């Protein structure tokens, strides 16, 4: 099996590529991104690719005889509000290019991460797969398009498109990349380096989150799931939900001198438009999804690994 990963140098891609290479063989997983310097760190095989460059995308699929695409290239929520036009170009036209290139190039399967940002203020807590989608951000709108276009290509052309609606993803290996849930990573960096963090959301802001190992598990587990068991193309998944204050308290147990304050900015409105909890029972039933990490265990692992990475003792 030959795999192409777009957006391979992002928060998820930089950890997914090594995992897939271990699974399928280094030579069978092609990393692609627009950032050459970061691609070199992932090592070959890699290709410099802007997903808006359809000609290059077609050529890569043909040259490497790609069977599966993990389409991770995207502009995230907060950055998407700073430049909604670019967000539309990359996230909507990019996913269309990937779907069309896959259809014409004989690709068997596409995995597209979606997001809790597809929901909006009208969404009730604990939404299911069929809950109303009325996002208030360009990022969320673009991901609704990705989901619906994926469904369309599956129903019309038989292209096996699958995806998980990821919550905020937390990782110590890669810095956050412009999302509304970045505070859940930044707080750990600040706790170790400065002993203090100013959140850009209110203390009672509660959002669904997931530790990176679980995010990688969800993506790869759904990719390999028995198609006859799948009721949906895109599934809710979640690891945990916690408030900013709860995160502070958990960090304080491990770094007692840590302090925090809360100064909500424009990202607070985005956070308020998303549900605080997610129902992922369909994923549990259809492909045996189950997260491995809770808040306390994740916090301990984050602090242990980040302090080593930053060369700091806590």
Task: Enumerate the predicted regions with their spans.
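N-terminal Rossmann NAD(P)H-binding glycine-rich loop of SDR-like oxidoreductase domains
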Residues: 3-23
